[in-house]
């Protein structure tokens, strides 16, 4: 097997808050994949950094009464500590506010500019007259122009999933002051993305991408690529644009360059690793980004186009994952399920979560649910009851009957050959990011080993005379099987693996060691490696999280003069044909981050199909059979995925969205008045 040379990154956490379990999904996924590559003997480097620029950081530092640099140092130290607590093994964790990143950002920009890829044009944008600052999209809220949902951000609606310009919002207000923004003109710099349309279409066919993301990208191409605004006006926290007064690079320009900046800093500290080998020269190296599905646009369009324009190597692949829900719902501060990484670590071992997340992950772009009851049961059953139990059951027999030394040859090797025979299957699962399948394969093998113990019954043999050799054989087979299982799970459970290697008196194991049996080998006395999760521990975690976040909650800024909607007459209301509809089927729409597709029974109106942008808030299966409130006479809307024939009504606020449900006495087709 030839040695591969691989660069890997996770998306950069924003340096404006703490790491939470949503972040950990991505970093656990990336870390497992990197550890697997290293276990196979490949040269694999994993870097990350804090995303350290933007208006939000400037305002946060101002609010705390410190400089942005002081804030960034505090947050970066906290982030590094949290990631290390979860056994995330970054080779280097940097910051985008660094000399390396400034130099690379300027180099890329100047190259793009010299090749004619940078445009200038005057734009009008919203400005807070009280704070005297141009407002980023996420600092503007108002009523969605498509579905009329209140308090939606300036770039997209979390209720219906629509995207729009901040100027399209109805009754917009600044989240900083509550003031109504005014329009103000400014000259901005744009990256001419449409020039790269043909290149991107070609790259997307060659790159390692998931089918769902290819569908999404096809949708974006169909809509047409637009020049990308890469500048922001002072006051702003970031890198100044060369030869441009009071202009700064938009955070999303220098943030992905941060992957390169972090790797360059690592290479400067480790001279045997060449930055140019991975990013400048056409060597046989690989480059992969692990990201959330919500930032695919930046990583699959802007980023490869920038690299192409600057004459740098492009990503070999970009791997997207879904969002994390807890107990089937969006993470909630009020329910205590918005859990910070450091809060989790106060109560539970990191490998519990690493294992559970791994068991849920696949190569698909799917959301992951952390069901806390299932989490406890799976950890207790799989890790404590099946895996660690093998060592705890067999080690005492080896100590008692063979002086802690395994046999010189296995008389019955069928079970061990079964385990070794799965090595390439499990390796393929890891390589393809099918971690859930890999875990299931390993646990099926653990079941087979436990069945072997139950069949051979060494505890019965121990009561008979003359059975020492047979018992030593059984214990040696089980401990060898335990060693193999530990190697298979080492990318997921690095600390348990290290403890197991110490117990077995082995040097750090690699994938190649699968074929090297542990014969005539002395082991140490067994000591517990993992404890069961108690329900009380989970309850304490939730309570701690709830109390911690309650203390941080502040009253949100309200618009200073946000008028209510204009009055309507009863005749206006009567124009709406509101009906009760029964959900016959509901499923996620492949290629869409937000949409669910409903098949509805509307009584005498027949069957209707509706698309609704509520995927983040509801699991499809929980809605089947429910009675919902349906707008029957809304004009059908043609979408990429089909025609939406009406609308399902929901209630929402800043934190949550819930479909309106009718009680059990209602029937499909009933009118609402």
Curated annotation (Swiss-Prot):
One of its GO terms (cellular component) is cytosol. PROSITE patterns: AA_TRNA_LIGASE_I, TRBD. A motif ('HIGH' region) lies at residues 13-23. It is found in: Cytoplasm. Its cofactor is Zn(2+). ATP binds at residue 333. It catalyses: tRNA(Met) + L-methionine + ATP = L-methionyl-tRNA(Met) + AMP + diphosphate. A motif ('KMSKS' region) lies at residues 330-334. Binds 1 zinc ion per subunit. Its main location: cytoplasm. Residues 572-673 form the tRNA-binding domain. GO terms for biological process: methionyl-tRNA aminoacylation. One of its GO terms (molecular function) is methionine-tRNA ligase activity. It comes from the Bacteria. InterPro entries: aa-tRNA-synth_I_CS, Anticodon_Met, Met-tRNA-synth_bsu_C, Met-tRNA_ligase_1, Met-tRNA_synth, Methionyl/Leucyl_tRNA_Synth, MetRS_core, MetRS_Zn. Homodimer. Is required not only for elongation of protein synthesis but also for the initiation of all mRNA translation through initiator tRNA(fMet) aminoacylation. Belongs to the class-I aminoacyl-tRNA synthetase family. MetG type 1 subfamily. This is Methionine--tRNA ligase. The gene is metG.
């Amino acid at each position: 097997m030839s040695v591969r040379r691989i660069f890997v990154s996770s998306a950069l956490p924003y340096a404006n808050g703490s790491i939470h379990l949503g972040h950990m999904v991505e970093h656990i996924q990336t870390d497992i994949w990197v550890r697997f590559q290293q276990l196979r003997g490949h040269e694999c480097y994993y870097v990350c950094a804090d995303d350290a620029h933007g208006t939000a950081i400037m305002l946060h530092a101002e609010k705390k009464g410190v400089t942005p640099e002081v804030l960034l140092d505090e947050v970066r130290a906290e982030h590094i500590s949290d990631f290390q607590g979860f056994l995330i093994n970054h080779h280097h964790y940097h910051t985008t506010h660094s000399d390396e990143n400034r130099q690379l950002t300027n180099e890329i920009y100047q190259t793009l500019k010299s090749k004619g890829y940078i445009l200038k044009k005057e734009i009008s944008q919203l400005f807070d007259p009280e704070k005297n600052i141009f407002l980023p999209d996420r600092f503007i809220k108002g009523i969605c122009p498509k579905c009329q949902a209140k308090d939606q951000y300036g770039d997209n609606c979390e209720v219906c999933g629509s995207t729009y310009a901040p100027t399209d919002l109805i009754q917009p207000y600044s989240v900083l002051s509550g003031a109504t923004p005014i329009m103000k003109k400014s000259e901005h710099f744009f990256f001419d993305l449409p020039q790269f349309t043909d290149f991107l279409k070609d790259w997307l066919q060659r790159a390692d991408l998931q089918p769902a993301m290819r569908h999404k990208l096809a949708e974006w191409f169909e809509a047409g690529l637009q020049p990308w605004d890469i500048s922001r006006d002072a006051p702003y926290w970031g890198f100044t644009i060369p030869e441009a007064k009071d202009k700064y690079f938009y955070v999303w320009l220098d943030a992905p360059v941060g992957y390169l900046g972090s790797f360059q800093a690592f290479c400067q500290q480790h001279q045997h690793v060449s930055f140019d080998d991975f990013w400048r020269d056409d060597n046989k190296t690989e480059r992969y980004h692990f990201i959330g599905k919500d930032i695919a646009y930046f990583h699959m369009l802007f980023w490869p186009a920038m690299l192409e324009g600057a004459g740098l190597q492009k990503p070999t692949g970009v791997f997207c994952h879904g969002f994390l829900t807890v107990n089937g719902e969006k993470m909630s501060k009020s329910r205590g399920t918005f859990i910070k990484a450091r809060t989790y670590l106060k109560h539970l071992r990191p490998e519990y979560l690493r294992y559970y997340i791994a068991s849920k992950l696949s190569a698909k772009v799917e959301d992951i649910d952390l069901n806390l009851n299932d989490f406890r049961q799976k950890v207790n059953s799989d890790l404590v009851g099946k895996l660690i139990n093998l060592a705890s059951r067999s080690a005492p027999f080896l100590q008692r009957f063979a002086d802690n030394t395994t046999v010189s040859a296995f008389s019955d090797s069928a079970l061990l050959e079964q385990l070794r025979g799965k090595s390439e299957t499990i390796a393929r699962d890891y390589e393809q990011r099918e971690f859930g399948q890999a875990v299931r394969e390993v646990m099926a093998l653990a079941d087979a080993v436990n069945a072997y113990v139950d069949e051979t019954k060494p505890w019965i043999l121990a009561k008979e005379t003359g059975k020492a050799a047979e018992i030593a054989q059984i214990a040696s087979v089980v401990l060898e099987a335990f060693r193999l299982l530990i190697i298979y799970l080492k990318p997921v459970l690095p600390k348990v693996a290290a403890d197991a290697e110490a117990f077995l008196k082995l040097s750090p194991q690699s994938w190649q060691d699968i074929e090297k049996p542990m014969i005539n080998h002395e082991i140490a006395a067994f000591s517990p490696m993992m404890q069961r999760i108690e329900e009380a521990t989970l309850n304490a975690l939730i309570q701690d999280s709830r109390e911690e976040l309650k203390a941080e909650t502040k009253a949100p800024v309200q618009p200073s003069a946000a008028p209510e909607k204009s009055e309507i007459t009863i005749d206006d209301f009567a124009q709406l044909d509101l009906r009760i509809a029964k959900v016959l089927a509901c499923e996620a729409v492949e290629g869409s981050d937000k949409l669910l597709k409903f098949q509805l029974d509307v009584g005498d109106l027949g069957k209707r199909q509706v698309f609704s942008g509520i995927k983040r808030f509801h699991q499809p299966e929980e809605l089947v059979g429910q009675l919902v409130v349906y707008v029957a006479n809304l004009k059908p809307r043609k979408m990429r995925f089909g025609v939406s024939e009406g609308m399902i009504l929901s209630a929402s606020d800043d934190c949550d969205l819930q479909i309106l449900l009718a009680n059990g006495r209602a029937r499909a087709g009933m009118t609402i008045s």
